[in-house]
């Protein structure tokens, strides 16, 4: 599983020019599911997304990486993006052999969303499988790639 985490001041996703998901301060999560992903990988990524200290403490000048999205009562925008598993090493067209099938990916993506909703934070999403326009006001910019493969500690 791969997730690009971006700390944002604002983010929204549109489908056919209609806003389907929108957040304020929090994290934008671009999510890809691989052929080997299971609930174990999802659980690990969920914990990381919620607990990573990616926000500054406004009361401290010394510790930029002090608060998690939970600590600041931030918001989450989750967008499926299978292209994170695109392999561009050969030829001129990306290969998506490592991406889960749409049926499997949708099921695991929905499980990921449901587990994040259990945090009590506001969670917004795009529409799985749709062509989307994502607007991201990246704060910092702060962007990280989380990756968890089966049997990868």
Curated annotation (Swiss-Prot):
Gene3D superfamilies named among the record's database cross-references: D-tyrosyl-tRNA(Tyr) deacylase
Q: Name one GO cellular component term.
A: cytoplasm
Q: Where in the cell is it found?
A: Cytoplasm
Per its record, how is this protein called by name? D-aminoacyl-tRNA deacylase
EC number assigned by the record = 3.1.1.96
Q: List GO molecular-function terms, semicolon-separated.
A: D-tyrosyl-tRNA(Tyr) deacylase activity; Gly-tRNA(Ala) deacylase activity; Ser(Gly)-tRNA(Ala) hydrolase activity; tRNA binding
Motif extent (Gly-cisPro motif, important for rejection of L-amino acids): 140-141
UniProt source species: Trichodesmium erythraeum (strain IMS101)
Give the Pfam families listed for this entry.
Tyr_Deacylase
